[in-house]
Design a protein with these regions (language model features):
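Iron-sulfur cluster-binding electron-transfer modules in prokaryotic oxidoreductases
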Residues: 1-183
Length: 183
C-alpha cells in the first residue's frame, strides 16, 4: 500500500491498530512487521484534519450555528492523547461556540461490551453523561467514536431528549453543505 495515511473515523480502531497490534502479533515476526507498518500510517479523522490537512481558520465557518459540546471518547483522550484537536476544529476552523462539558473525557457507558455485559452500570454512567450534556445547554454533542454515538443516541432517544449526537465527520459534512448550499 502506497498511501501515506490510513484515516479512520473510529478512534477505537486507530487505538487498536496503533497500540494493540504489537501484542496480537508478538509471536509472528512477519505479521508484527506488517502491523507496525500499518500502525505508523493509521490516524484518526480529527487529528488528520488538524495536523495533516491543517485546515485554515474559518474555512468551514458557514455562519451562525447552534452551540456544541464535545464528548472525548475514552481511548481518544487516554490512549491517543487527542485533547485540543477537536476544540480547534470546532472553534477555529468551523467558527462554532464550544461549551465545555463537565467530565467530558469520562466514559459514556458504552465501553466496548460494557453496555451489553453490564447494562445497569452502563445506564447509570450514561445518565450522568446526559446530565453533563444537559448542563451545557448545547443542543448538539460531537464525538469521534461510533460506539459512543450509538450509545449516546440510543440513550438520548430513550430519555426523550432532543439533543443531537453527531460524529465529527457528520459535523464537517453539515458545515460543507451549508457552505455549498446556503439556502
Amino acid at each position: 500500500m502506497d498511501a501515506d495515511y490510513i484515516v479512520s473515523g473510529a478512534a477505537s480502531c486507530v487505538a487498536m491498530i496503533g497500540h494493540d497490534y504489537d501484542h496480537l502479533f508478538a509471536e509472528d515476526p512477519e505479521w508484527l512487521e506488517r502491523s507496525r507498518r500499518v500502525g505508523k500510517r493509521v490516524i484518526d479523522l480529527t487529528t488528520f484534519l488538524d495536523r495533516v490537512a491543517r485546515l485554515p481558520a474559518g474555512c468551514l465557518d458557514a455562519g451562525p450555528f447552534h452551540p456544541v459540546t464535545y464528548h472525548h471518547f475514552c481511548q481518544s483522550h487516554n490512549v491517543l492523547k487527542i485533547r485540543e484537536e477537536p476544540k480547534r476544529l470546532i472553534t477555529e476552523v468551523m467558527g462554532m461556540e464550544l461549551r465545555e462539558m463537565n467530565e467530558a473525557s469520562t466514559c459514556c457507558g458504552f465501553g466496548g461490551s460494557v453496555s451489553i455485559d453490564h447494562p445497569s452500570m452502563a445506564k447509570h454512567i450514561v445518565e450522568r453523561k446526559l446530565a453533563n450534556i444537559d448542563d451545557t445547554g448545547a443542543p448538539l454533542v460531537i464525538t469521534d467514536n461510533p460506539g459512543c454515538i450509538l450509545h449516546l443516541r440510543g440513550s438520548v432517544d430513550a430519555s426523550g431528549r432532543t439533543v443531537r449526537v453527531l460524529h465529527v465527520a457528520e459535523l464537517v459534512d453539515e458545515r460543507l453543505r451549508q457552505l455549498t448550499d446556503p439556502a
